[in-house]
């Protein structure tokens, strides 16, 4: 599961993934986190 700090980060992550980027690379690029839990932390709500 990916969690982003804001909508902009989420959009960057989604665009990166759509373009064929890996989850890790896209998370790093967009400032998002990849987590194993089912719910995102409050500081990464998107």
Curated annotation (Swiss-Prot):
The keyword Secreted applies. Keywords: Disulfide bond, Plant defense, Secreted, Toxin. Pfam families: Thionin (PF00321). Disulfide bonds join 3-40, 4-32, 16-26. It comes from the Eukaryota. Transmembrane segments: none annotated. SUPFAM superfamilies: Crambin-like (SSF57429). GO terms for biological process: defense response. Its main location: secreted. Gene3D superfamilies: Thionin-like. InterPro entries: Thionin, Thionin-like_sf. PROSITE patterns: THIONIN. One of its GO terms (molecular function) is toxin activity. It is found in: Secreted. Belongs to the plant thionin (TC 1.C.44) family. Thionins are small plant proteins which are toxic to animal cells. They seem to exert their toxic effect at the level of the cell membrane. Their precise function is not known. Monomer. This is Viscotoxin-C1. It comes from Viscum album (European mistletoe).
